[in-house]
């Protein structure tokens, strides 16, 4: 959770790298966000927290606002090393997909006839498509 300094000297707390930066700029400068960020920095310093700090905004990094077509929301965050990487239900390549993701694949296959490799649970390509 490193801060970046802009050319005007103002510290930028988040750098997503696309249009989300402008859309959320006021939020990232707000008092509630500063408190939340301080809390998270402390948590990351004291505990094993998932996803890694540099992955927190991956969903926004991979999907610019103008490209969003669907939003997936998860209920139970991943809590093991190598699982969470900032995309709901997704796990990095080489990590077996959890049952919840396999259920999603099964439902999509049932409804739309689309086949999935059940051994790959990395959804970055989905995020890039919106």
Each PLM stretch: what is its role?
Residues 16, 20-21:
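C-terminal accessory regions appended to core domains
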Residues 1-11:
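N-terminal amphipathic/basic-hydrophobic helices that include classical n-h-c signal peptides
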Residues 14, 26-130:
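A polyanion-binding, active-site-adjacent surface
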């Amino acid at each position: 959770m490193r801060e970046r300094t802009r050319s005007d000297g103002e510290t930028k707390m988040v750098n997503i790298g696309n249009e989300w930066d402008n859309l959320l700029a006021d939020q990232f400068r707000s008092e509630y966000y500063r408190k939340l960020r301080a809390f998270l920095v402390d948590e990351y310093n004291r505990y094993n927290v998932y996803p890694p700090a540099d992955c927190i905004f991956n969903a926004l990094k991979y999907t610019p606002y103008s490209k969003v077509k669907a939003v997936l929301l998860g209920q139970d965050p991943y809590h093991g090393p190598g699982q969470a990487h900032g995309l709901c239900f997704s796990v990095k390549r080489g990590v077996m997909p959890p049952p919840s993701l396999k259920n999603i694949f099964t439902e999509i296959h049932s409804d739309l006839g689309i086949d999935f490799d059940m051994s790959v649970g990395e959804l970055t390509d989905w995020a890039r498509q919106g």
